[in-house]
């Protein structure tokens, strides 16, 4: 990789395993993990309206600027259009649950349409799915 991060967007409902997977991916492949909850807390913006969610999307997209190596974005990213706009090199849909504990997020979340990997069950073997996807170019 040269002068630019390889961005992996882990999208899915709250509780689908995004954070756990991001931590495992960083441990195996290196890079950085950017957690949407931590970004929201740093901004002290707890508005979950459509406008608040869009602001969070913009913060998450900006969080990759200036980074190198693998960057794992751990983010619900509820709207298909936003997932496309993120500019991620790899989109992983964590489709492990159908309903989260947050009714407002359930309503806002659009089932992923464009993705590179779809994870439907969470197990240790799933890490091998990334072996041919996360290759550092010299």
Please tell me what each predicted stretch does:
Residues 18:
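Conserved lysine of the Walker
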Residues 49-102:
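Glycine-rich phosphate-binding loop used to anchor ATP phosphates in small-molecule kinases
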Residues 37, 94-95, 120-123:
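Residues at the C-termini of beta-strands that transition into short coil/loop
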Residues 5-9, 32, 70-72:
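Residue-level preference for the first positions of well-ordered beta-strands
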Residues 43-44, 99-109, 128-130:
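Short, charged, surface-exposed secondary-structure boundary motifs
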Residues 22-65:
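Conserved substrate/cofactor phosphate-moiety recognition/catalytic segment
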Residues 1-4, 8, 24, 28, ...:
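NTP-dependent small-molecule kinase module
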Residues 14:
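The conserved Walker
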